[in-house]
């Protein structure tokens, strides 16, 4: 659960990576654990850590991201600032996805 995620993050930080990769870090967690893991990731973002985060937590992604990439069928469909991608998506698929996740 969340304890395993936090331990994995601590092990990663011990290696002092230039970039931290997160692939759906909250997908298998209980709802109460999700917020704990997101708080750890938010703190890393506030420290200025470079991270690549794959997530369906759209509100969180919007808050902590400096750049957003929207993928569809494994291809980059849209890329830009959180404001641009979340508020003014260009592609029809991205518009549909964002409107269903508000």
Predicted regions and their residues:
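Conserved catalytic motifs of ABC-family nucleotide-binding domains
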Residues: 16
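Catalytic Walker B motif of ABC-type/P-loop ATPase nucleotide-binding domains
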Residues: 20-23
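Helix N-cap at the start of a conserved alpha-helix in ABC-type nucleotide-binding domains
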Residues: 31-33
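H-loop/switch region of ABC-family ATPase nucleotide-binding domains
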Residues: 55-56
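A short, surface-exposed alpha-helical micro-motif characterized by mixed small hydrophobic
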Residues: 61-63
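ABC ATPase "signature
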Residues: 79-80
